[in-house]
Swiss-Prot record:
GO MF entries: glutaminase activity; imidazoleglycerol-phosphate synthase activity; lyase activity
Name listed for the protein in its UniProt record: Imidazole glycerol phosphate synthase subunit HisH
Principal subcellular localization: cytoplasm
Biological process per Gene Ontology, one example term: L-histidine biosynthetic process
Annotated pathway: Amino-acid biosynthesis; L-histidine biosynthesis; L-histidine from 5-phospho-alpha-D-ribose 1-diphosphate: step 5/9
Pfam families, sorted: GATase
Lineage per the UniProt record: Bacteria, Bacillati, Actinomycetota, Actinomycetes, Mycobacteriales
Gene Ontology CC: cytoplasm
Organism of this sequence: Corynebacterium diphtheriae (strain ATCC 700971 / NCTC 13129 / Biotype gravis)
Subcellular location: Cytoplasm
SUPFAM superfamilies on file: Class I glutamine amidotransferase-like
Keyword check for Hydrolase: yes
Length: 210
């Protein structure tokens, strides 16, 4: 049974994520203990709320350093919702700019849709060769609830680095990043733990990669 550390930094629906992971066969510990986080097979970083507040909470438990240490060693990390957003360079919400973890270039900004938050079920354009979306049909829907996102992707591969796999979604005129697969670091803007059977399959796919 794979062991997953669910990072407790004062943000995110921890119990919902814990139950979802346990249902697909993971052994889960809710923790911010560095020893437990670094030893786990996988680290899941949830996130609900404002970008700046989440980053402050993350730094208060040295979560940003733990994420960096795991990734430096090629150890799997997955972010959900704001847990995905904070992996980018920066975020700007309510006029407050904050630095993120800097794992990916890009800025989290408010969507331009008339109806916000983008809340409910939506399809995604899964990246070719995606491992997270393996076994899921193109018309599969996932549960979103957010008003901010990343609308521009600036990380292209070259001869030395492989470009991450980027999955997109559309809400009104906004096209935004719905998921990223970048070696050991993966993340989703939607909530797999609230996405029924489809979300369970995606989490199972991630667990199988650990």
């Amino acid at each position: 049974m794979k062991k997953v550390a669910l990072l407790d930094y004062g943000s995110g629906n921890l119990r919902s994520a814990q139950r979802a992971l346990e249902r697909v066969g993971a052994e889960v510990e809710v923790t911010n203990d560095p020893d437990v986080v670094l030893a786990a097979d996988g680290l899941l970083v949830p996130g609900v709320g404002a970008f700046d507040a989440c980053m402050k909470g993350l730094k208060a438990v040295q979560g940003d350093r733990m994420i960096g240490q795991r990734l430096a060693g090629g150890r799997p990390v997955m972010g959900i919702c704001v847990g995905m957003q904070i992996m980018f360079d920066s975020g700007n919400e309510h006029g407050i700019s904050a630095a993120g973890c800097g794992q990916w270039p890009g800025n989290v900004e408010k969507l331009e849709a008339r109806v916000l938050p983008h809340m409910g079920w939506n399809t995604v354009e899964a990246a070719q060769d995606s491992q997270l979306f393996a076994g899921l049909d193109a018309d599969t829907r996932f549960y979103f609830v957010h008003s901010y996102g990343v609308r521009w992707w600036e990380f292209e591969g070259d001869g030395l680095t492989r470009a991450p796999l980027v999955t997109w979604a559309q809400h009104e005129s906004d096209r935004f990043v719905a998921a990223v697969e970048n070696g050991a670091l993966m993340a989703t803007q939607f909530h797999p733990e609230k996405s029924g059977d489809a979300g369970a399959q995606l989490l199972r796919n991630w667990i199988d990669l650990l």
